[in-house]
Amino acid sequence: MDVRITIETTFDNGEKRTHQLDGISRPYRVTCPDGIGLRLEDGKRILEQIQRVILYDQVDEIIRESRVCPDCASVRAIHDYRTRVLDTLFGRVRVKAARLRRCSCD
């Protein structure tokens, strides 16, 4: 048996993004009791992937919305990208986040 795990993110602007996570494979002939259901290491791996996908999409949406200047509504340029480390309940996640230039109206 093969199990596929897919996450679909729907952003506030209506855009949808689909992420394919690792799957789980189980033989149909189970030889021991721990071969039935989800194993602890499977659960940890899948939870880590879910957390990473959610964080990446959240950071992407925050940056996309922050690029629009709240005063003049022009789109601010991206200065560069930096790696950020976010500490979550389920561990640390590294994300690549844009640094934005100041708007000319400031």
State the predicted function of each range:
Residues M1-S104:
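Short, conserved DNA-binding cores of transcription-related domains
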